[in-house]
Amino acid sequence: MRGGAAGPTAGEPPGTEAEAEEVEESSAGDDEELELGLSLGSKKQQQQQHAPCRILTARDLQPAAALSPDSSVSSSSPAAAAAAGGKRAEGPTATTSPGTVASGHPHSSFGVVGWPPIRQFRMNSLFNQAKENTSETDTKKTATNESDVQKDKEEGEKKGRVAGWVKVNMDGEVIGRKVDLNAHRSYKTLALALELMFTKPSIGLCASHNTNSLKLLDNSAEYQLTYEDRDGDWMLVGDVPWEMFVSSVKRLRIMRTSDANGLGQRYQGIHRTIASTRGRS
């Protein structure tokens, strides 16, 4: 019978119908939960899409910048990424604040110079040190040059080469001459040079220069060569070594032999007096 189809059949056990009803109810409940979950998920997505965007400030990004100063602002904060996705126009305003850049690179104000990188204050200190070393080297060179000049001067004084140019006068001549003693190395060359300066036919000297130069140094000619020393005394040329003569001469004079002989006699008398005084003592 059709009316008895809802009930248990003769061949089926009595619990089969109850189990079928429970399966139908559980499937219906699962469908309702699935629909409810889908509806809730769509509502959450709608709420997230319609959520208002907020502009980030330096306070929001400061902790992230302190943790990783080399990382960019967009990667250090997830909220910044969400805001950048929502509004592109407002993103650069929040990420380019001066406080953020200063907090991300605290040592950028010192500056880096050259390669390998050297900070500015270190470069200045190295430059000042090099400048001081250069000035010290120049001072040492100047002191060395001054000491060398002083040594050369002292050596020249010791060698007797400080006389240089001296005046030469001749009896009977109004105008005098000058001669460089450093250009000569002996009395002979000096006498020859002076004879060539003052030679005249009236002097009565021989024509030979060698003979004239020798006669100026002895008492056989009309004129005799004398000099004034540092003490102001007039002396005959040729009595002392050449180096001593050059170091002590002040000026030269070609004196007449008569006057020069008196000078020589006086000089010899002084030496005799000194020798006798030493013998008595």
UniProtKB/Swiss-Prot annotation:
It holds the Pfam family AUX_IAA. Its main location: nucleus. It is found in: Nucleus. Residues 133-157 have a biased composition (Basic and acidic residues). Residues 1-115, 130-157 are annotated as: Disordered. Highly expressed in flowers. Expressed in shoots. Residues 18-35 have a biased composition (Acidic residues). Gene3D superfamilies: Phosphatidylinositol 3-kinase Catalytic Subunit, Chain A, domain 1. Residues 163-259 form the PB1 domain. Keywords: Auxin signaling pathway, Nucleus, Repressor, Transcription, Transcription regulation. A motif (EAR-like (transcriptional repression)) lies at residues 36-40. Coiled coil: none annotated. It comes from the Eukaryota. Aux/IAA proteins are short-lived transcriptional factors that function as repressors of early auxin response genes at low auxin concentrations. This is Auxin-responsive protein IAA10. The gene is IAA10.
